[in-house]
Amino acid sequence: MTDYNKLFNLHLEIFDNLTLQTIIAHDKENYYVIKDISKIEYTNYLKVKNDKLPFLKPLKIVKHENHTYFLYNYYENHQSIYEAYDGILKTISLLHKKTAKKVPQPKMAEIKYKKIALIANDRFNMLEMKIRNIELNPVKNDLSWIYLSKYHIILDIKLEIYKMIKRLKMIKDDVEVGINHGFPSQVHFFNNSFISYKYLKEGVIENDLYKVFLDFDSLEINHLEIIDKYLDEKYSKKYFKLMVLFSYLLMCDIEPNYTCASKYIKLTNKISRFMYQFKNYK
C-alpha cells in the first residue's frame, strides 16, 4: 500500500475512495485529492500545463515506483449541475479557440454524410418493419399501443435527419478543429473535477458538444440556453442537431418486452423535448 504521508510529506488520513486511482484524504486543516496518473494523462498534462485554461492544476507531483501521483486541493460541491454543464462547454470552447487551425471544407465530409444517411435508412427500415408487424398483428396488448402511440416521433426525426444532411452538404465554409478534452462524462467531471488529461485529443467542437449534451440530456433544464452560445448559425447548429438525432436513432429499438418499451418511452420523450427546445436549429 502506498504511503501518501511519506510521498507528500503530509499527515494524511484517507477519507474516501472515488475510484481505484483517485482518493480523498485530509490532514487537520485541509482536504486533498490524490490521483494516480497514467503515462498518457501525464504526457497530455505536460502539453497544457502552462496554458491559461480552466483546468485544476496539481499542488504537487510525485513520481514513485513507476507511478505518478498528483495532489490537488479538494473542493466539495463547489458547482451546481447547471454550472458544471456550462463549465464543461466553456472549457471545450476555450480549448478549441486557443488551438484552432483550418482544415478541409465540410464538402470533404460528404462521404461521412452519405454513410450516416445509409445507416439511418437501414435503421428506419428495421423500425418500420417492426411497427408494421405490430400493426398487422390482430392481437394488441399494452406494449403494442406504447410503440404505436410514440412512433410518430421517430417519423419526425427521420424527416429532420434527412433535411439536416441535405443542408449540411450544401455548406462550403471552413470548420475549425483543435485540442479538446474529448467528451467528459457527467460522472467523470464530478468525480475527477477535470483532473484527467487522458482524453485530450483533436476534434471539432460541434462533435464534443453533442456528446456532452447526450450525457446531460436527462436533466430538466433549458439546454438551448447553455449550448446556443457555443455554436455558430451556419454550420455548427445543423451538425449538432444532426448528430444528436442520429445518436437517438441508434439508441432506438422495438422489442416485445417491458424493458425495451420503458427505454422507448424515455427516449421518445427526450427526442420530443430536444425537438421542441432546438426547433430553431434549421
Where are these regions (language model features)?
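Regulatory N- and C-terminal appendages and interdomain linkers associated
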Residues: 1-9, 148-163, 264-282
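ATP-binding glycine-rich phosphate-binding loop
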Residues: 2-27
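Active-site acidic catalytic loop and adjacent metal/ATP-binding pocket
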Residues: 22-26, 162-209
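A conserved alpha-helical element in kinase catalytic cores
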Residues: 30-68, 79-94
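A glycine-centered beta->alpha junction motif in the catalytic cores
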Residues: 67-82, 100, 128-136, 248-264
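Conserved kinase catalytic-core helix
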Residues: 78-123
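An alpha-helical support segment within catalytic cores of ATP-dependent transferases
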Residues: 129-181, 281-282
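Active-site activation/catalytic loop segments of kinase-like enzymes and analogous catalytic loops
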Residues: 206-235, 245-273
